[in-house]
């Protein structure tokens, strides 16, 4: 619409002439096949003319109407739009002024359901938290018991190694009397083979 305001205004007259048969055919005469309608007086900055693009339907059997002048007393066509109608705004349904009993009951039921679901979820999380804490305590106790058992095994191994070394020292010592036999009893000698 802004580009049409920059064009030169034409008076509201009908120019006689023949319409072009095709869009590619250019008019060589000075007359144009456009019809501009509008008041003859000064305008208020709005374009009042109408240009219809396209090919005119014309046959030889149709009589050519006499060109007539448009009456100047016709006011221009003005389209007024509602200022509330703007593009890009989302239409939302209007809220009902009074809610019915069914809607109130549904809202109460929905509130109770939301509360029950929230309570159930929080209860599940609380129980799961307690179970995890109990399992963590049991795991810590099992780790402490395992560490204590491993320490006891290390101590017992060290004691057994020390005892084995002492037994080796005692068994390897030649200074001590032979404690295997009873004193005074000589072991019997096996007589040799008889002939």
Swiss-Prot record:
A GO CC term attached to the entry: cytoplasm
Modification(s) after translation: Phosphorylated.
Cell compartment(s), UniProt: Cytoplasm
InterPro entries: BLOC-1_complex_su-3 (IPR017245)
GO molecular function, one term: protein transmembrane transporter activity
GO biological process, one term: melanosome organization
Region (Disordered): 1-72
Chain positions found as Phosphothreonine: 59
UniProt keyword annotations, A-Z: Albinism, Cytoplasm, Hermansky-Pudlak syndrome, Phosphoprotein
UniProt similarity note: Belongs to the BLOC1S3 family.
Function: Component of the BLOC-1 complex, a complex that is required for normal biogenesis of lysosome-related organelles (LRO), such as platelet dense granules and melanosomes. In concert with the AP-3 complex, the BLOC-1 complex is required to target membrane protein cargos into vesicles assembled at cell bodies for delivery into neurites and nerve terminals. The BLOC-1 complex, in association with SNARE proteins, is also proposed to be involved in neurite extension. Plays a role in intracellular vesicle trafficking.
Associated pathology: Defects in Bloc1s3 are the cause of the reduced pigmentation (rp) mutation phenotype, a mouse model for human Hermansky-Pudlak syndrome (HPS). Rp mice are characterized by abnormal melanosomes and display altered expression levels of the proteins of the BLOC-1 complex.
Quaternary state and interactors: Octamer composed of one copy each BLOC1S1, BLOC1S2, BLOC1S3, BLOC1S4, BLOC1S5, BLOC1S6, DTNBP1/BLOC1S7 and SNAPIN/BLOC1S8. Interacts directly with BLOC1S2. Component of the biogenesis of lysosome-related organelles complex 1 (BLOC-1) composed of BLOC1S1, BLOC1S2, BLOC1S3, BLOC1S4, BLOC1S5, BLOC1S6, DTNBP1/BLOC1S7 and SNAPIN/BLOC1S8. The BLOC-1 complex associates with the AP-3 protein complex and membrane protein cargos. Interacts with BLOC1S4, BLOC1S5 and BLOC1S6.
Name this protein carries in UniProt: Biogenesis of lysosome-related organelles complex 1 subunit 3
Species the sequence originates in: Mus musculus (Mouse)
Gene designation: Bloc1s3
């Amino acid at each position: 619409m802004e580009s049409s305001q920059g064009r030169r205004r034409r008076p509201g007259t009908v120019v006689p002439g023949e319409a072009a048969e095709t869009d590619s055919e250019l008019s060589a005469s000075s007359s144009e096949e456009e019809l501009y309608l509008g008041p003859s007086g000064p305008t208020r900055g709005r374009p009042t003319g109408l240009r219809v693009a396209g090919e005119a339907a014309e046959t030889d059997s149709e009589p050519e109407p006499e060109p007539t002048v448009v009456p100047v007393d016709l006011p221009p066509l003005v389209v007024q739009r509602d200022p509330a109608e703007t593009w890009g705004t989302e239409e939302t349904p209007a809220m009902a002024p009074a809610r019915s009993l069914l809607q109130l009951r549904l809202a109460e039921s929905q509130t109770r359901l939301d509360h029950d679901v929230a309570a159930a979820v929080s209860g599940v999380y609380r129980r799961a938290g307690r179970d995890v804490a109990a399992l963590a305590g049991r795991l810590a106790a099992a780790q402490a018991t395992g560490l204590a058992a491993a320490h006891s095994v290390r101590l017992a191994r060290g004691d057994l190694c020390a005892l084995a070394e002492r037994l080796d020292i005692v068994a390897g010592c030649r200074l001590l009397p032979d404690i295997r036999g009873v004193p005074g009893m000589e072991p019997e000698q096996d007589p040799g083979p008889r002939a």
